[in-house]
C-alpha cells in the first residue's frame, strides 16, 4: 500500500474524496494490519551514533528510513534504489516521510483493559456485564477472583471470591468443578462469552414487565449499549487489549538539544514503561515465577497501559523527571491545547504580518495603508514571478537578491502586484464577522498600518497602541471572495441589528453637530442665498457665520431625474452638509436640516443606504467624515474646569434630603417602619435628590445665554455639546463631574445608604473617597473575570448553532410566532414595527379600519409597510420564524427573513447560526469590558406608579375592585389590566396592575396623556380583606410566631411574624387572621372559603385583634427584597443561565391547570397546595411550598393555567411543558433582550430565535409505538415526524414525544456529529461513546468540515458541494449508461433533467 508513495512517472490519482468518517473499536486483527512490525526493546536511539536501535521505539526497519532514499547502513542511496529492502539493515529505501504514517505494535504477555471503556462514565464494560465499576476493578487489579463457570456448585456466575474464599471453594468442590479467573483474562472471558442477541431479547422482556422507574432506567441504559454493539459490529472483548498499537515515531519525536541532551515526547516514556514491564512479565512467565510475582507484574502492566492511554484517570498521575505529569494520548486531544482546538480548528497561516495601527483619514473607505516593508515581504512570491516574467532576473536566486537590495524596479513591480489585490485585516479579539475585513492596500512610508476611521467601530479598534494582522488571500477564488463578500464597502450594516455600522464617531460627530447648530442674533440673520457659491463668499467675508438663521436654496432632482430646487429655513452649516447628500428624490434636505446628533447621523446614513444603494452611501460616508474632521478642527472645541457647572440649588436639595433621611431615621426609631423599609426609603430619597440635581445641572448647561454687549448668543457649553451630540461622555458622567456622584454600591451589589454628595469638581472627602473605591475595584475585577465568561458564552453559542445554515428557499411551514410591541412600565420599549421589520408575514396583514391587505401572506415586511402598520396601530402580527421552520437540516430563507447585513432577503448557504451566535456573544464581551464606566454608581430601578401613555377611554379587563375605608378604589384581582382605548375602540395600551394598587380611574373614564392611573407601594405586598368584619388572630403567639417590638418613647408596637418552625413548640402552629361578624362567626368569602388569611414569615401585621375592617383594607404587609443595582454583571450570568436552560435558584412555581386553590394538609415544613380543576376530566394537581416563602394566594382564589403560584423567575422547562413552545420562545427572547436593552444594545430577535431553535431540536419519546425507540430516548424532532409518517403509511403505530429544552452545552454535545462534539468538550467521553456505537459522521456541519480540511458547506462552499453532488450523480448515470449501452430513453431523459437542474 505504501510502495506507491512517490512514483514520479505515473503520478498517483488525486487523493480519494470521502463523504463520511466512521469511528469504532479497533480489533486486534485491525491493529496488526496497521502495524509494520513488533517493537521488542524499550531503547530509542544509540546515544553514540545517534542511529535508531533495531526493534526499538524508533527502529528504522519497522518505521522507515531517517533520510530520504537512504538505508540505515548506507549501502543503498538515492532514487534509483527506490523500493529495495536492504539485506544488511532491513530498511526499505523510500521517503523519510513514511515515518509519520507507519505504525508498530506491542504484543502483550497478558491482556489489559482499555481504560476509556472501563473508567469513562458510565463504564461501558460495567454496564455490559451488569457489574459495578468497583467490582470490575477488584478483578482487574488482582484483588478478587470472579466465577465464570459455576458448574454444578453452589457458587453463582459473576460472584467475587477473595483469595481465601477461592481456596476454600477449591477445597470444597475440587478444582475442575468450577472456573474462577482473576485479572483482565477473567473479564475477557466474560465479555467473549456474551450472547448479545439473547441478552437484548431478555432485556426487552424485562423492560416490558418492570414497573419501577429506577429499574427501567437501568435496563434501558444496558439495552442501549448492547444494541450499540450489535448494530456497530464491534465485539465486547475488543475492549480488552492483547495488542497495543504504537504511533509513528515522527509524531512523538526525539530532538537533540545543544549540549548533547535530548528533548523527547512524553509518549516515548510511557511506551518505554509498557515495553519494560511487558518484557519482564514475559521473562517471569518463562521462568515459571511464583503466582504472586507474576500477578504483581500483570497489575503493573495494566497500570502502564492505563497511563499511556489516559494518564491520571486512575490512581496517581505518572510524572516525568521534572515532577510534571506526562502527557498521555488522551491529553494530546483534550482541551484548548489539544489536537482538535489547537491544530485542527485554528491553524497559523503563512503570508501574514502584524503591526501597530494609526488613523488614515485621507484614505477611501475601501483602502488601507500598508507599510512598504510589509508589502514587500508579504507579496514576495508574486514579485519573484513578475521579475522573472519581465526579464529582470532569470532565477529565483537573482530575484531574491534584487528584492533584498530593494532596487527601484522592485518597487514598480510591487505597485503592479498590489493593484487590485485585496488584503485581509483582522483585529483580535475577533468577536463577530466584522473583525476581519478586506481592503485594497496603498503603499505608505513608515511602519504602521493605516486604518480608515469609519471602520473602527466594526473592529472595535482605537489608536492607543492597538495592533492588527494582515493576511494575503492567494488563490483567485480567495481574492474574489475577499473583494465581493469581505470588502469594507460591502459591510455597511451591522449583522446583529441591521443598523449602519459605518457611522462617524467622536470628533466627526462633534464637527457635524457643531456645523448644524442654530444660533440666535448672529450677523446676517434672515439673508437669502441662491446657491453655495454665494454662501461660501458670505462665509469667507464673515457676513454670516455657520450658525446664522438664513433661507437657502437646496438643489435636488425629482422622480424623473430632472433638477428641482426648494427654499428652506436653515443655516450655512447645514447647507454645507446638504451639499454632500446624494441627489435623489427620496433624500430630502430635511434629513440634515436638524441637529446632527450621532443618532440622527446614523438615521441619515441608513436613509441614504435604503434609497440610493451601496455605492452612493460609501461615497457619502467618506465625504461626511472629511467634513466632520475639518469642522471639529476648525471649531476648536475643548473644555476647562469652568465648563462643568455646579447648580446653585445643590446645597438646598442636599439639605432637604438630609432632613428627610433624619425623619425616616426617627420613624424607624419610633417603630413605625422596619429597618428594610427605612433603608428603601432613604435610598429612594437620595436617588430622587441625585436626579433633581442632575436635572438642574443639565438645565444650566443647556441654557442659552446672550452676550450683554454684542447681543450675540454665547458659545454653547462644550461638555454639553460633546455629550448631547453623542461624541463622548454621558449625562451620567457629567453628573459625577458637576452634580453629585450619588449612591454607590457595595461589592455585594447592595446600595450604601450614605451617598457621595460631592462631585469630582469639588473633590471628594476622605470618607466619600473610601466609599467610592468599592465601586471602582468591583469594576476592575469584573472586567477581568467577565471577559473570559463572555468568550466562553460565545464559544458555546457558536458550537450549538454552527450547523444552522439556510438550506432552502421555503419550507412551507404554516405555523409561526405572534409578535406584539414590548411594553415596560407603560413605556413602549420595542414597537411592533421594529420587531416585524424584515420578517415574513405568516397571514395577510389587514388594515384594522379599511380591511385592505397591507402585506400578503409570505411576503417580507419592508420599511414602507412598517410605516403603514405603525400608523394603523396594529397590535399583533403573526410572522414566520426560524423557531417554527420545518426544514430538515438548517433553516429556510422565508422563515429567517431579511439578511440584516445586506438589507435583502437572505441567500441560500448563509451561516445564520454562526451570525446569531456572534451577534449575541459580541456585545457580551463589550458590555463586560464596560461595567466600570459607571464607577459602580447605583441606579434604583423601581416604578411605583403608572401614567397613561395615550389619550383615550379606560376599560378594566377582569375588573375586580372595591372601595376601602379611605374611599379609594383598590385592585383586588390577581390578573387585572387597565386598557386604554382610542376613539375607534382600538387597544392603545395595556397595563397590568398589581394586587393592592390604588386606582385613580374607573371603567369608562377618559384620561389625558401623562395622567396618573394607579400607584402602589413598590417595597411591600399587601394582604387585603374583601369582607367587612372584626379581626381575630389565630396561632399568633408572642415569642413563638410573632415578635412584638415596642418603642419606649412612643409606646407604638409593631408585630412581625417570625419563623415559627424554629422552636419545637411552634412546629404545629398555622399563623393566620380570621374575620368574624358581630356574633363571632367566621365570615365566608365570595368564592366560598372561610375568611382566613394565612401569614408567611416576615409579614408585618397592620391591624389589632378586634379591629373593624372594611373590604379593601390592608391587614398585613409582606416586605419585598430591597433594591439591588441592575447592571450587566447580573446580566451576563443571566444570559448564560437562560441559554443553558438552568432552573433558577428560587424558581417560580407555575400552575399547570385552571382551577381553584385549596390548602391541603401541611407537612412539617412544607405547605401543601391543591388546585382543583374547573374541568372534571382532569386530576387535581398538588404543589409543596416551603413554609418560609412569602406566599400570596389565599384559600379559594381562582387561578389560571400558567399563573405563578410562587413568585420568582420561572424555569424555562416549566413554561415549555405548561404553555408550549411559542410561550417559551417569547419568554426567552424577551428575558434575554431585557438584559441587553438595559445596556442599550440592539440585537434582532431572530438571532435569539435561531439559538432557541437549536435548543429545541430534540423530543423525548413518551410512547414508542413501532418506532423501535425506547421511552426516554432523545430523538430529533424532524426525524421522529418522518418515521411516524412512514409508519402511518404502513399502518403501524406511530410514536409520540414531548419537546425537551436542552441547554446550549448539552445540545452541542448531542449533535449527530461526534467530531464536532469531541472538539467542543469532554473529548474522551464523546469519543468513547461514538466508538462503542460505531458512529458515522456525515460531515454536515461547519466544524467537522474545518477539522477534516474541506470547504465548509456554507456560503460559496455550499454551492461547490451542491455542484459536486450533481456531478457525481451524473457521472454515475453516465457509467450506468455505458454499462447498458442499450441507451434506454428514460435514462437519457433523467440525464437531461439533471443537467437542466444543475444549470438553473
Swiss-Prot record:
Native source organism of the sequence: Brucella suis (strain ATCC 23445 / NCTC 10510)
E.C. numbers: 2.7.7.6
KW Transferase (keyword) present: yes
HAMAP family: RNApol_bact_RpoC
Textual note on the cofactor: Binds 1 Mg(2+) ion per subunit. Binds 2 Zn(2+) ions per subunit.
Superkingdom, natural source: Bacteria
SMART domains, per the entry: RPOLA_N (SM00663)
Gene: rpoC
Gene3D superfamilies: 1.10.132.30, 1.10.150.390, 1.10.1790.20, 1.10.40.90, 2.40.40.20, 2.40.50.100, RNA polymerase II, clamp domain (4.10.860.120), RNA polymerase Rpb1, domain 3 (1.10.274.100)
Protein known as: DNA-directed RNA polymerase subunit beta'
One Pfam family hit: RNA_pol_Rpb1_4
Keywords for the protein's UniProt record, in alphabetical order: DNA-directed RNA polymerase, Magnesium, Metal-binding, Nucleotidyltransferase, Transcription, Transferase, Zinc
Amino acid at each position: 500500500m505504501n510502495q506507491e508513495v512517490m512514483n514520479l512517472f505515473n503520478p498517483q490519482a488525486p487523493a480519494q474524496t470521502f463523504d463520511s468518517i466512521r469511528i469504532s473499536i479497533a480489533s486486534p486483527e485491525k491493529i496488526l494490519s496497521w502495524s509494520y512490525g513488533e517493537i521488542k526493546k524499550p531503547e530509542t536511539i544509540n546515544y553514540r551514533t545517534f542511529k535508531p536501535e533495531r526493534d526499538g521505539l524508533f527502529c528504522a526497519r519497522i518505521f522507515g528510513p531517517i533520510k530520504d532514499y537512504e538505508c540505515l547502513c548506507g549501502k543503498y542511496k538515492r532514487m534509483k534504489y527506490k523500493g529495495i529492502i536492504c539485506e544488511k539493515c532491513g530498511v526499505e529505501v523510500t521517503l523519510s516521510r513514511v515515518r509519520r504514517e507507519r505504525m508498530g505494535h506491542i504484543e502483550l504477555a497478558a491482556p489489559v483493559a482499555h481504560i476509556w471503556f472501563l473508567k469513562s462514565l458510565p463504564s461501558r464494560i460495567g454496564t455490559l456485564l451488569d457489574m459495578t465499576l468497583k467490582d470490575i476493578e477488584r478483578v482487574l487489579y488482582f484483588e478478587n477472583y470472579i466465577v465464570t463457570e459455576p458448574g454444578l456448585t453452589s457458587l453463582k456466575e459473576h460472584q467475587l471470591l477473595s483469595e481465601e474464599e477461592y481456596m476454600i471453594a477449591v477445597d470444597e468442590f475440587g478444582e475442575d468443578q468450577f472456573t474462577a479467573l482473576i485479572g483482565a483474562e477473567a473479564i475477557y472471558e466474560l465479555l467473549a462469552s456474551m450472547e448479545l442477541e439473547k441478552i437484548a431479547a431478555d432485556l426487552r422482556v424485562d423492560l416490558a414487565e418492570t414497573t419501577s422507574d429506577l429499574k427501567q432506567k437501568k435496563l434501558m441504559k444496558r439495552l442501549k449499549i448492547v444494541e450499540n454493539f450489535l448494530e456497530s459490529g464491534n465485539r465486547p472483548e475488543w475492549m480488552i487489549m492483547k495488542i497495543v498499537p504504537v504511533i509513528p515515531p515522527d509524531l512523538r519525536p526525539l530532538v537533540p538539544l545543544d549540549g548533547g541532551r535530548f528533548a523527547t515526547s512524553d509518549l516515548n516514556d510511557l511506551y518505554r514503561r509498557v515495553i519494560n514491564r511487558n518484557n519482564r512479565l514475559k521473562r517471569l512467565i518463562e521462568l515459571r515465577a511464583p503466582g504472586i510475582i507474576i500477578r504483581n507484574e500483570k497489575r503493573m502492566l495494566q497500570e502502564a497501559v492505563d497511563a499511556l492511554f489516559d494518564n491520571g484517570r486512575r490512581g496517581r498521575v505518572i510524572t516525568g523527571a521534572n515532577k510534571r505529569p506526562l502527557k498521555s494520548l488522551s491529553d494530546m486531544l483534550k482541551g484548548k491545547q489539544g489536537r482538535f482546538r489547537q491544530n485542527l480548528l485554528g491553524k497559523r497561516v503563512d503570508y501574514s504580518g502584524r503591526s501597530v495601527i494609526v488613523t488614515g483619514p485621507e484614505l477611501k473607505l475601501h483602502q488601507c495603508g500598508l507599510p512598504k516593508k510589509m508589502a514587500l515581504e508579504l507579496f514576495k512570491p508574486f514579485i519573484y514571478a513578475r521579475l522573472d516574467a519581465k526579464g529582470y532576473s532569470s532565477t529565483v536566486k537573482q530575484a531574491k537578491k534584487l528584492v533584498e537590495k530593494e532596487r527601484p524596479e522592485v518597487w514598480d513591480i510591487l505597485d503592479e502586484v498590489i493593484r487590485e489585490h485585496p488584503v485581509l485585516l483582522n483585529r483580535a479579539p475577533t468577536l463577530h464577522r466584522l473583525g476581519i475585513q478586506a481592503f485594497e492596500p496603498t503603499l505608505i512610508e513608515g511602519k504602521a498600518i493605516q486604518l480608515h476611521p469609519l471602520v473602527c467601530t466594526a473592529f472595535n479598534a482605537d489608536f492607543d497602541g492597538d495592533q492588527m494582522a494582515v493576511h494575503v488571500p492567494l488563490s483567485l477564488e480567495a481574492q474574489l471572495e475577499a473583494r465581493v463578500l469581505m470588502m469594507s464597502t460591502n459591510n455597511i450594516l451591522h449583522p446583529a441589528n441591521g443598523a449602519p455600522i459605518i457611522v462617524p464617531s467622536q470628533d466627526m460627530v462633534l464637527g457635524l453637530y457643531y456645523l448644524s447648530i442654530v444660533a440666535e442674533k448672529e450677523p446676517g440673520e434672515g439673508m437669502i442665498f441662491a446657491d453655495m457659491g454665494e454662501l461660501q463668499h458670505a462665509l469667507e467675508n464673515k457676513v454670516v457665520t455657520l450658525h446664522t438663521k438664513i433661507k437657502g436654496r437646496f438643489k435636488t432632482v425629482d422622480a424623473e431625474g430632472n433638477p428641482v430646487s426648494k427654499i428652506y429655513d436653515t443655516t450655512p452649516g447645514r447647507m454645507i452638509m446638504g451639499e454632500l447628500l446624494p441627489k435623489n428624490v427620496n433624500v430630502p434636505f430635511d434629513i440634515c436640516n436638524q441637529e446632527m446628533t450621532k443618532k440622527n447621523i446614523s438615521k441619515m446614513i441608513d436613509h441614504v443606504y435604503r434609497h440610493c444603494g451601496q455605492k452612493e452611501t460609501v461615497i457619502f460616508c467618506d465625504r461626511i467624515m472629511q467634513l466632520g474632521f475639518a469642522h471639529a478642527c476648525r471649531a476648536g472645541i475643548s473644555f476647562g474646569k469652568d465648563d462643568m457647572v455646579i447648580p446653585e440649588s445643590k446645597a438646598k436639595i442636599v439639605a432637604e434630603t438630609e432632613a428627610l433621611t433624619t425623619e425616616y431615621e426617627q420613624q424607624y426609631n419610633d417603630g413605625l417602619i422596619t429597618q428594610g423599609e427605612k433603608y428603601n426609603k432613604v435610598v429612594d430619597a437620595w436617588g430622587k435628590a441625585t436626579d433633581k440635581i442632575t436635572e438642574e445641572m443639565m438645565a444650566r448647561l443647556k441654557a442659552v445665554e446672550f452676550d450683554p454687549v454684542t447681543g450675540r448668543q454665547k458659545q454653547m457649553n462644550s461638555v454639553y455639546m460633546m455629550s448631547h451630540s453623542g461624541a463622548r461622555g454621558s449625562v451620567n458622567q457629567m453628573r459625577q463631574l458637576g452634580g453629585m456622584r450619588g449612591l454607590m454600591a457595595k461589592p455585594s451589589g447592595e446600595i450604601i445608604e450614605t451617598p457621595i454628595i460631592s462631585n469630582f469638581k469639588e473633590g471628594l472627602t476622605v470618607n466619600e473617597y473610601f466609599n467610592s473605591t468599592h465601586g471602582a475595584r468591583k469594576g476592575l475585577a469584573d472586567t477581568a473575570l467577565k471577559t473570559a465568561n463572555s468568550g466562553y458564552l460565545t464559544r458555546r453559542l457558536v458550537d450549538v448553532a454552527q450547523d444552522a445554515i439556510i438550506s432552502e428557499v421555503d419550507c412551507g411551514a404554516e405555523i409561526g410566532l405572534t409578535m406584539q410591541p414590548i411594553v415596560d412600565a407603560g413605556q413602549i420599549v420595542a414597537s411592533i414595527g421594529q420587531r416585524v421589520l424584515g420578517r415574513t408575514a405568516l397571514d395577510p396583514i389587514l388594515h384594522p379600519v379599511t380591511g385592505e391587505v397591507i402585506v400578503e401572506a409570505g411576503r417580507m415586511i419592508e420599511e414602507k409597510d412598517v410605516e403603514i402598520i405603525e400608523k394603523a396601530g396594529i397590535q399583533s402580527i403573526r410572522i414566520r420564524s426560524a423557531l417554527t421552520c420545518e426544514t430538515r437540516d438548517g433553516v429556510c430563507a422565508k422563515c429567517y427573513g431579511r439578511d440584516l447585513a445586506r438589507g435583502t432577503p437572505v441567500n441560500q448557504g448563509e451561516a445564520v447560526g454562526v451570525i446569531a451566535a456572534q451577534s449575541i456573544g459580541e456585545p457580551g464581551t463589550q458590555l463586560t469590558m464596560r461595567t466600570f464606566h459607571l464607577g459602580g454608581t447605583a441606579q434604583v430601578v423601581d416604578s411605583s406608579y403608572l401614567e397613561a401613555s395615550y389619550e383615550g377611554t379606560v376599560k378594566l379587563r377582569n375588573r375586580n375592585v372595591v372601595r376601602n375605608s379611605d374611599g379609594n378604589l383598590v385592585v383586588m384581582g390577581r390578573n387585572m389590566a387597565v386598557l386604554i382605548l382610542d376613539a375607534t375602540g382600538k387597544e392603545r395600551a395595556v397595563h397590568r396592575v398589581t394586587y393592592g394598587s390604588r386606582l385613580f380611574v374607573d371603567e369608562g373614564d377618559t384620561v389625558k396623556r401623562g395622567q396618573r392611573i394607579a400607584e402602589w407601594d413598590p417595597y411591600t405586598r399587601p394582604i387585603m380583606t374583601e369582607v367587612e368584619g372584626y379581626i381575630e388572630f389565630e396561632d399568633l403567639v408572642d415569642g413563638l410566631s410573632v415578635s412584638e417590638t415596642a418603642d419606649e418613647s412612643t409606646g407604638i408596637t409593631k408585630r412581625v411574624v417570625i419563623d415559627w418552625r424554629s422552636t419545637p413548640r411552634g412546629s404545629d402552629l398555622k399563623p393566620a387572621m380570621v374575620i368574624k361578624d358581630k356574633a363571632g362567626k367566621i365570615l365566608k368569602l365570595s368564592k366560598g372559603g372561610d375568611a382566613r388569611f394565612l401569614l408567611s414569615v416576615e409579614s408585618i401585621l397592620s391591624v389589632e385583634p378586634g379591629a373593624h375592617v372594611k373590604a379593601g383594607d390592608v391587614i398585613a404587609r409582606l416586605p419585598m427584597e430591597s433594591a439591588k443595582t441592575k447592571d450587566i454583571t447580573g446580566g451576563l450570568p443571566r444570559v448564560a443561565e437562560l441559554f443553558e436552560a438552568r432552573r433558577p435558584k428560587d424558581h417560580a412555581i407555575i400552575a399547570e391547570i385552571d382551577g381553584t386553590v385549596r390548602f391541603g394538609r401541611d407537612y412539617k415544613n412544607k405547605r401543601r397546595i391543591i388546585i382543583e380543576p374547573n374541568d372534571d376530566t382532569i386530576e387535581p394537581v398538588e404543589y409543596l411550598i416551603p413554609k418560609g416563602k412569602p406566599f400570596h394566594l389565599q384559600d379559594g382564589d381562582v387561578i389560571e393555567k400558567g399563573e405563578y403560584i410562587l413568585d420568582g423567575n420561572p424555569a424555562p422547562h416549566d413554561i415549555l411543558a405548561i404553555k408550549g413552545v411559542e410561550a417559551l420562545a417569547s419568554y426567552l427572547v424577551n428575558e434575554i433582550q431585557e438584559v441587553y436593552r438595559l445596556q442599550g444594545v440592539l440585537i434582532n430577535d431572530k438571532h435569539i430565535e435561531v439559538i432557541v431553535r437549536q435548543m429545541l431540536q430534540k423530543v423525548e419519546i413518551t410512547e414508542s409505538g413501532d418506532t423501535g425507540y425506547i421511552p426516554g430516548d432523545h430523538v430529533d424532532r424532524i426525524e421522529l415526524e418522518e418515521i411516524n409518517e412512514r409508519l402511518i403509511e404502513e399502518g403501524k403505530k406511530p410514536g409520540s414525544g414531548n419537546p425537551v429544552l436542552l441547554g446550549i452545552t448539552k445540545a452541542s454535545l448531542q449533535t449527530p456529529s461526534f467530531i464536532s462534539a469531541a472538539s467542543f468538550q469532554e473529548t474522551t467521553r464523546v469519543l468513547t461513546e461514538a466508538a462503542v456505537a460505531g458512529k458515522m459522521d456525515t460531515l454536515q456541519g461547519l466544524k467537522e468540515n474545518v477539522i477534516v480540511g474541506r470547504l465548509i458547506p456554507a456560503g460559496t462552499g455550499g454551492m461547490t458541494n451542491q455542484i459536486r453532488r450533481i456531478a457525481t450523480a451524473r457521472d454515475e448515470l453516465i457509467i450506468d449508461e455505458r454499462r447498458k449501452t442499450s441507451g434506454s430513453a428514460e435514462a437519457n431523459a433523467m440525464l437531461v433533467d439533471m443537467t437542466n437542474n444543475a444549470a438553473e
